[in-house]
Structures are given as structure tokens and as C-alpha cells.
Curated annotation (Swiss-Prot):
Disulphide linkage map: none
InterPro entries: Ribosomal_uL3, Ribosomal_uL3_bac/org-type, Ribosomal_uL3_CS, Transl_B-barrel_sf
Maturation and modification: Methylated by PrmB.
Protein name, as recorded: Large ribosomal subunit protein uL3
Quaternary state and interactors: Part of the 50S ribosomal subunit. Forms a cluster with proteins L14 and L19.
PANTHER family named in the record: 50S RIBOSOMAL PROTEIN L3, LARGE RIBOSOMAL SUBUNIT PROTEIN UL3C
GO biological process, one term: translation
Length: 215
């Protein structure tokens, strides 16, 4: 069993840069970090594991189905734009209660964090863009195979395409994590947190922020 810690749900706001005291500028990603509301506390005795379920933001009532509406009503929490869970240690459950809020106080400047998001969708792409294949020669004798993927394998034996073969297909729109990003700045008044470097996804996408699991 690993070591779990509370996380935070934010929204990617975009990228900027921050000047350090020595005059160097570093790229940072700004994350909108409004307070997360606790919807449910899950315990190993009842649910089989210990976790804190949170929501953030708001959603129109017509977009909330009946099961979700009842779930939020039971917790007496305004319906948010989604539900997320963070595994925590059993000893940490006492720090949270249904209806309470989780803020940026769980992070500190200089701390290393892992951030998870959904990458930008690229649609259907060929092997050159999707898997960094080499292009065919752009010269005499090559008329239709400049971006062709090439051979898929052998002939009658084995007579099939092996699973996992790199081919054309849908690219992007997958869950991806970036580890060990440094927290550069925390602005509590503006509900912003700045981390060094880039994070997955487009501006406006939800991201999960956790304490770094590997340092």
C-alpha cells in the first residue's frame, strides 16, 4: 500500500513567465484554483478504501441528473462540474468533513507536485505525426509513398498484424501526468497557483494536483 496524500482540482488558465531575483525568467503555467468542496468521505470499513470525494465550480440544475442531484443534496453541497476522488491515509480522514472546503493551504511555494490532465485532441493522424516515423525519400522514383507507413509485417506466417503495431489512428485526448513540477507562486486572493513548466491539456481543462510521489 502506497503513501497517499490529499490533492486538489484546478483549471488550467494558460502560460506566462516569472522573473526570479537574479533576473532569469522561467516559464510557468497558471492554474485557477478555487476552493474544492468535500462531497463524501469514503472509509475502508464501508467502501474498501480511504478517500475524499470533492467537487468544484458550478453546474446548472438542468445538467445534473437525478442520481447526482440526490448525491449533492445529501451532502448539502452545490452541484459542481464533476466529481473527483483522492486517496488519503486513514489518519488524514479526520481533517476533512462533508461540506467543508479544501484550499491552497495544502501546498507551499517550492513544493514539488504531480499534475494530471487530458491532452489536446489531435484527431486522426498518420504515423509520422503520431509515432515520429521517418518520411520516405522526396526524390525521383517515389511518387506516392512520401508519408506511407511502410510494411505492417510478414506474409502467410504469421498472417496477422501483431497487437500494439504502431499505425495511424486517433491521437491525443488521453490522460497524462507530469511529475515533479515546482510550485513557483501561490496567489490566494486571485485563487491562482503557478507551477514551473508546462502541463497537459488546453486552457480551461480540469487538472489534478497532488504532492509529488517521486522526488
Amino acid at each position: 500500500m502506497g503513501c497517499y496524500s490529499m490533492g486538489f482540482v484546478g483549471r488550467k488558465a494558460g502560460m506566462s513567465r516569472v522573473f526570479l531575483e537574479d533576473g532569469c525568467s522561467i516559464p510557468v503555467t497558471l492554474i485557477e484554483a478555487t476552493a474544492n468542496r468535500v462531497v463524501q468521505i469514503k472509509t475502508s470499513d464501508v467502501d474498501g478504501y480511504d478517500a475524499v470525494q470533492v467537487t468544484v465550480g458550478s453546474r446548472r440544475s438542468v445538467l445534473v441528473n437525478k442520481p447526482e442531484s440526490g448525491h449533492f443534496a445529501k451532502a448539502k453541497v452545490e452541484a459542481g462540474r464533476g466529481l473527483w476522488e483522492f486517496r488519503v491515509e486513514k489518519t488524514q480522514l479526520g481533517s476533512y468533513s462533508v461540506g467543508s472546503e479544501v484550499g491552497l493551504s495544502i501546498f507551499a511555494v517550492g513544493q514539488k507536485v504531480d499534475i494530471q490532465g487530458i491532452t489536446k485532441g489531435k484527431g486522426f493522424q498518420g504515423t509520422i505525426k503520431r509515432h515520429n516515423f521517418r518520411m520516405g525519400d522526396a526524390t525521383h522514383g517515389n511518387s506516392l509513398s512520401h508519408r506511407a507507413p511502410g510494411s505492417l509485417g510478414q506474409r502467410q506466417t504469421p498472417g496477422r498484424v501483431f497487437p500494439g503495431k504502431k499505425m495511424s489512428g486517433h491521437m491525443g485526448a488521453v490522460r497524462q501526468s507530469v511529475q515533479n513540477l515546482e510550485v513557483v507562486k501561490i496567489d490566494v486572493e486571485r485563487c491562482l497557483i503557478a507551477v514551473r513548466g508546462a502541463i497537459p491539456g488546453a486552457s480551461g481543462g480540469d487538472v489534478l494536483i497532488r504532492s509529488a510521489s517521486k522526488i
